Swiss-Prot record:
GO CC term, one of those recorded: cytoplasm
InterPro entries, alphabetized: ITPase-like_fam, Maf-like
Reactions performed catalytically: a ribonucleoside 5'-triphosphate + H2O = a ribonucleoside 5'-phosphate + diphosphate + H(+); a 2'-deoxyribonucleoside 5'-triphosphate + H2O = a 2'-deoxyribonucleoside 5'-phosphate + diphosphate + H(+)
Gene3D superfamilies according to UniProt: 3.90.950.10
GO BP term, pick one: nucleotide metabolic process
PANTHER family xref list: BIFUNCTIONAL DTTP/UTP PYROPHOSPHATASE/METHYLTRANSFERASE PROTEIN-RELATED, BIFUNCTIONAL DTTP_UTP PYROPHOSPHATASE_METHYLTRANSFERASE PROTEIN-RELATED
The keyword Cytoplasm is annotated on this UniProt entry: yes
The species this protein was found in: Synechococcus sp. (strain JA-3-3Ab)
Function: Nucleoside triphosphate pyrophosphatase. May have a dual role in cell division arrest and in preventing the incorporation of modified nucleotides into cellular nucleic acids.
Highest rank taxon of the organism: Bacteria
Pfam families: Maf (PF02545)
SUPFAM superfamilies listed in its UniProt record: ITPase-like
Protein name: Nucleoside triphosphate pyrophosphatase
Amino acid sequence: MLPPIVLASQSPARRQLLEAARIPFRVQPSYFDESQIQSPDPVELVQKLAAAKAEAVAAQQREPVLVIGADSVLYLGGEILGKPANALEAERRLRQMRGEVGELYTGHALIDTRQNRRLVHYAVTRVFFAKPSDEEIRTYVATGEPLNCAGCFAIDGRGSLFVERIEGCPGNVIGLSLPLLRRMIQELGYSLTEAWN
C-alpha cells in the first residue's frame, strides 16, 4: 500500500502539479540551505539538492512516508541558472536567453522511510526561447514572476509567452516530471494510481 506522500518543497507549481493529478500529499518544506551544495554539472547539482531536501524532511518523520524532494535549474550557454537574485539579474538573464535553446534539469529524490530506500533521478527538457523585446522583458520582470523561477521564466504563467516550444516533459519545466515520479514509485514497489482509491 502506498504510504502517505510528503512534498519537501515550498514551490506552488510543484504543489499544483500533484493536485492536478489528484495525488494526495502534504507539504513540509525542507528549508535546506542550497548554497551548501555547488557543482558545475547541472545533473549532479539538481540531484544532490533534491536528495538533500528530501533527506532533511525524511529525518523529521515519525510515520512511514514517501518524501519527494526536487530542484530545478536552467542550463544555458554553459552556465547554470537558478533563481535570479534580483530584478536586474532577471532582466539580464532574459535578454541572454532571447532566441536561445536551454535545458531545464530537475532532480527528483524519493525517500521511502518504511523500507529505508532512497532513489535519485533527473529529467531534462529542452526549452526554445522566443525573442521578447526589451520592453516586454521589463514588463515581465515587473510582475515579479521570474524572480521565483529557475531560469527566470514560468512556463505555466506569464512566461509562457516567451517559450516557442519544448522537447521533453512539460511538467519537468514546471518543477516535477510526473512520469518520472511514477516510475520511481514503481521501482519502490508501489503504484502512484493507488492514491486515487
